[in-house]
């Protein structure tokens, strides 16, 4: 402290003003030091936990006695026995279960009544649109399904199937046609999926097949002689595989079961002789030459020796439903006229006519 004590007082010493000022200064300094000590929260006396039993006290804020009494006397925070009895009487375990069961039953009834599949997606009876030529504006919005049957001939890809409509508005409308998938008996071609679009102002696009593409692999039987200086249709007549029963073995032609782009591959193994030769292997579309698959032309110095010549190639051919393709060979040769040229009697490794549908729409030609 700043106070300086005087310890040599005599009984008759006078008290002067300096002594009084010194005492007042001491009292003032003592008050300041006491205030500092009181506000010091850092344990100024170095008291230990053991000294005050702090190990038995939770380190949380404790309510004062006054706060406890205020809480105890606050009737709005606590229910009385009478109130508790009234509340418990309003709800029981049985009553609560009955209410829950009723809420569940009501929810199920609402869903079953308003969200059945046939209410959302199925169009039946007079509401079902059976004519493929009907404009897109006539269809309802949303996702709808319709059955197409009775050998429908109005423009759907097949006479039997299911139509799915995905319509957002008259400018965002896509329609799918699904074949029934019944491949028994004569319904060999009833599997497949087609798609078309509606645009208000331009109408329906043509149907485009997107699944269930046709394919065929056809061979020959026996030896077939080729005409000289002429075209000969190759007699492919042995079916190895025909997914849609689309190959006509009597006329040696593949008939397109639906519009699309087709990949044609053909090969023949010929009996030949060394001399002047000129061969053209061609694919014919609807009876007319469409593309040349292979061309061989030459002359041999040694004449009339036996030899074999393979002709083969591939080409894409766009076709509409009902169009047909055939394989023809132009043949010209010199030398001994009695030595005929022919397609040899070979298996499908050498002689084959392959057809694979690639895409389900025949776009216009320019």
Curated annotation (Swiss-Prot):
Q: From what superkingdom does this record's organism come?
A: Bacteria
CDD domains for the chain: pyocin_knob (cd19958)
The text of the family note is: To B.subtilis XkdV.
What name appears for this protein in its UniProt entry?
Uncharacterized protein YqcC
The organism encoding this protein is: Bacillus subtilis (strain 168)
